[in-house]
Protein backbone atom coordinates (compact mmCIF):
# COMPACT_ATOMS: atom_id res chain seq x y z
CA UNK A 1 0.00 0.00 0.00
CA UNK A 2 1.22 3.50 -0.72
CA UNK A 3 1.49 6.48 1.62
CA UNK A 4 -1.89 8.16 1.28
CA UNK A 5 -0.65 11.16 3.32
CA UNK A 6 1.82 12.16 0.60
CA UNK A 7 0.63 15.20 -1.40
CA UNK A 8 2.10 13.64 -4.54
CA UNK A 9 0.13 10.43 -3.99
CA UNK A 10 -3.02 12.44 -3.28
CA UNK A 11 -2.45 14.42 -6.48
CA UNK A 12 -1.88 11.24 -8.49
CA UNK A 13 -5.07 9.73 -7.05
CA UNK A 14 -7.02 12.87 -7.97
CA UNK A 15 -5.51 12.89 -11.47
CA UNK A 16 -6.25 9.18 -11.87
CA UNK A 17 -9.87 9.77 -10.86
CA UNK A 18 -10.19 12.80 -13.12
CA UNK A 19 -8.69 11.11 -16.19
CA UNK A 20 -10.79 8.00 -15.59
CA UNK A 21 -13.93 10.10 -15.31
CA UNK A 22 -13.04 12.10 -18.41
CA UNK A 23 -12.59 8.84 -20.34
CA UNK A 24 -16.08 7.61 -19.45
CA UNK A 25 -17.68 11.04 -19.85
CA UNK A 26 -16.22 11.48 -23.33
CA UNK A 27 -17.34 7.98 -24.35
CA UNK A 28 -20.82 8.92 -23.18
CA UNK A 29 -20.68 12.24 -25.06
CA UNK A 30 -19.60 10.34 -28.19
CA UNK A 31 -22.65 8.11 -27.80
CA UNK A 32 -24.92 11.15 -27.49
CA UNK A 33 -23.34 12.88 -30.49
CA UNK A 34 -23.64 9.73 -32.59
CA UNK A 35 -27.31 9.36 -31.58
CA UNK A 36 -27.82 12.99 -32.69
CA UNK A 37 -26.29 12.12 -36.07
CA UNK A 38 -23.00 13.96 -35.51
CA UNK A 39 -20.44 11.26 -36.32
CA UNK A 40 -17.52 13.70 -36.67
CA UNK A 41 -17.95 15.06 -33.15
CA UNK A 42 -18.47 11.55 -31.79
CA UNK A 43 -15.11 10.53 -33.25
CA UNK A 44 -13.37 13.52 -31.66
CA UNK A 45 -14.80 12.54 -28.27
CA UNK A 46 -13.75 8.90 -28.77
CA UNK A 47 -10.23 9.88 -29.77
CA UNK A 48 -9.90 12.13 -26.75
CA UNK A 49 -11.36 9.42 -24.51
CA UNK A 50 -8.63 7.06 -25.72
CA UNK A 51 -6.00 9.63 -24.70
CA UNK A 52 -7.63 10.13 -21.30
CA UNK A 53 -7.51 6.38 -20.73
CA UNK A 54 -3.78 6.36 -21.45
CA UNK A 55 -3.31 9.23 -18.99
CA UNK A 56 -5.24 7.26 -16.34
CA UNK A 57 -3.08 4.18 -16.96
CA UNK A 58 0.03 6.33 -16.52
CA UNK A 59 -1.20 7.51 -13.13
CA UNK A 60 -2.25 3.97 -12.16
CA UNK A 61 1.24 2.70 -12.95
CA UNK A 62 2.70 5.24 -10.53
CA UNK A 63 0.12 4.46 -7.83
CA UNK A 64 0.25 0.69 -8.25
CA UNK A 65 3.75 -0.03 -9.53
CA UNK A 66 3.62 -3.18 -11.64
CA UNK A 67 6.80 -4.62 -10.17
CA UNK A 68 5.26 -4.54 -6.68
CA UNK A 69 1.76 -5.68 -7.61
CA UNK A 70 0.93 -9.36 -7.40
CA UNK A 71 -2.43 -10.94 -8.18
CA UNK A 72 -2.90 -11.20 -4.39
CA UNK A 73 -2.32 -7.46 -3.91
CA UNK A 74 -4.56 -6.60 -6.87
CA UNK A 75 -7.35 -8.67 -5.34
CA UNK A 76 -6.81 -7.04 -1.94
CA UNK A 77 -7.11 -3.56 -3.45
CA UNK A 78 -10.22 -4.58 -5.38
CA UNK A 79 -11.89 -6.13 -2.32
CA UNK A 80 -11.10 -3.06 -0.22
CA UNK A 81 -12.45 -0.68 -2.87
CA UNK A 82 -15.65 -2.59 -3.58
CA UNK A 83 -16.31 -3.13 0.13
CA UNK A 84 -15.89 0.59 0.78
CA UNK A 85 -18.36 1.32 -2.01
CA UNK A 86 -21.17 -0.88 -0.70
CA UNK A 87 -20.61 -0.33 3.04
CA UNK A 88 -19.80 3.38 3.22
CA UNK A 89 -19.79 5.40 0.02
CA UNK A 90 -23.04 4.38 -1.64
CA UNK A 91 -25.09 4.15 1.59
CA UNK A 92 -24.07 7.75 2.38
CA UNK A 93 -24.91 8.86 -1.15
CA UNK A 94 -28.24 7.01 -0.94
CA UNK A 95 -29.16 8.73 2.31
CA UNK A 96 -28.40 12.15 0.85
CA UNK A 97 -30.32 11.41 -2.36
CA UNK A 98 -33.33 10.27 -0.32
CA UNK A 99 -33.23 13.46 1.76
CA UNK A 100 -33.22 15.51 -1.45
CA UNK A 101 -35.99 13.44 -3.04
CA UNK A 102 -33.89 12.21 -5.99
CA UNK A 103 -35.70 8.91 -6.53
CA UNK A 104 -33.86 8.06 -9.75
CA UNK A 105 -30.52 8.54 -7.99
CA UNK A 106 -31.69 6.34 -5.09
CA UNK A 107 -32.64 3.57 -7.53
CA UNK A 108 -29.28 3.83 -9.32
CA UNK A 109 -27.40 3.81 -6.02
CA UNK A 110 -29.37 0.77 -4.82
CA UNK A 111 -28.22 -1.09 -7.93
CA UNK A 112 -24.63 -0.01 -7.34
CA UNK A 113 -24.72 -1.22 -3.74
CA UNK A 114 -25.83 -4.67 -4.90
CA UNK A 115 -23.28 -4.78 -7.71
CA UNK A 116 -20.40 -3.56 -5.55
CA UNK A 117 -21.17 -6.25 -2.99
CA UNK A 118 -21.27 -8.87 -5.76
CA UNK A 119 -17.93 -7.61 -7.08
CA UNK A 120 -16.33 -7.77 -3.62
CA UNK A 121 -17.66 -11.31 -3.13
CA UNK A 122 -16.38 -12.34 -6.57
CA UNK A 123 -12.90 -11.00 -5.80
CA UNK A 124 -12.95 -12.71 -2.37
CA UNK A 125 -13.90 -15.97 -4.05
CA UNK A 126 -11.02 -15.68 -6.52
CA UNK A 127 -8.65 -14.92 -3.64
CA UNK A 128 -9.89 -17.92 -1.64
CA UNK A 129 -9.55 -20.24 -4.64
CA UNK A 130 -6.03 -18.96 -5.29
CA UNK A 131 -5.11 -19.58 -1.65
CA UNK A 132 -6.42 -23.16 -1.89
CA UNK A 133 -4.49 -23.76 -5.13
CA UNK A 134 -1.34 -22.37 -3.58
CA UNK A 135 -1.76 -24.57 -0.49
CA UNK A 136 -2.28 -27.64 -2.69
CA UNK A 137 0.77 -26.79 -4.80
CA UNK A 138 2.84 -26.23 -1.66
CA UNK A 139 1.94 -29.74 -0.45
CA UNK A 140 2.89 -31.25 -3.81
CA UNK A 141 6.17 -29.33 -3.86
CA UNK A 142 6.94 -30.44 -0.31
CA UNK A 143 6.29 -34.06 -1.29
CA UNK A 144 8.60 -33.71 -4.31
CA UNK A 145 11.30 -32.04 -2.21
CA UNK A 146 11.20 -34.89 0.31
CA UNK A 147 11.40 -37.45 -2.51
CA UNK A 148 14.38 -35.67 -4.11
CA UNK A 149 16.10 -35.37 -0.74
CA UNK A 150 15.60 -39.10 -0.13
CA UNK A 151 17.11 -39.83 -3.55
CA UNK A 152 20.11 -37.60 -2.83
CA UNK A 153 20.56 -39.22 0.58
CA UNK A 154 20.47 -42.69 -1.03
CA UNK A 155 23.07 -41.67 -3.62
CA UNK A 156 25.31 -40.11 -0.97
CA UNK A 157 25.18 -43.26 1.23
Locate each region found by the language model.
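Non-heme di-metal
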Residues: 1-157
